[in-house]
Design a protein with these regions (language model features):
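Glycan-recognition and catalytic cores of secretory/periplasmic carbohydrate-active enzymes
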Residues: 1-200
Length: 200
């Protein structure tokens, strides 16, 4: 976690996909974004992994540096000028044909699950508000499958690796997983908020 914190992230809070290290010295040999538009671009699912991963690092270690990195990544993603109004990101924030690029539900589901986890550790309402908006979008007919359709997956329009032509605009099991995890975390947050309001 510390090595990734040191070498994967850019000053603006975004991250590379892959960092190649010298096996003998541990020094960085190269940085790239294999599944993104370019090495210096911000691949959407990679940004979601960064937010999710460092929120979970904080959960288990309580080291503030991890939460701060998750927050920096959140700010990059949620204030990016190329983020659509429904908060479902294009497959890469720097893809050349925006707004005519694929919009993967998979990246959004990971983000939502992370944002709900973040609400446990921050009093700022923006994290839950953002997560709720993402889930509202994912639950719409634009992304949510009808029962019995889409091979019985919950979400449509995920993207695996666009540059490699793999899993393009298809359902993906991990998108459904993080969607369900986000729903569970949303439910927990809502129950806790209701309990606090009753106690008042």
């Amino acid at each position: 976690a510390d090595m990734t914190l040191k070498n994967h992230f850019r000053m603006d809070g975004s991250s590379y996909h892959v960092v190649d290290y010298d096996m003998r010295t541990g020094k960085v040999r190269s940085r790239c974004t294999a599944q993104g538009y370019s090495d210096e671009s911000a691949w959407a699912r990679g940004q979601a992994w960064g937010i999710y991963g460092y929120t979970m690092c904080y959960r288990y270690t309580r080291q503030l540096k991890y939460l701060e990195q998750a927050e920096a990544a959140y700010e990059f993603v949620c204030t990016h000028p190329n983020l659509p109004e429904d908060l479902i990101p294009y497959w890469d924030f720097d893809a050349v044909n925006i707004p005519h690029e694929l919009i993967p539900s998979s990246a959004a589901a990971i983000k939502a699950a992370a944002f709900y986890e973040f609400t446990i550790y921050s009093k700022k309402p923006k994290y839950k508000e953002t997560a709720d908006k993402v889930m509202h979008s994912l639950s719409s007919s634009d992304y949510r499958s009808k029962i019995g359709e889409n091979h019985n997956f919950l979400l449509m329009h995920s993207v695996g690796s666009y540059p490699h032509g793999n899993e393009i605009d298809v359902p993906l099991i991990y998108a459904d997983y993080y969607f369900l995890e986000a729903l569970k975390r949303k439910r927990d947050c809502d129950i806790e908020a209701k309990s606090k309001s009753v106690q008042k």
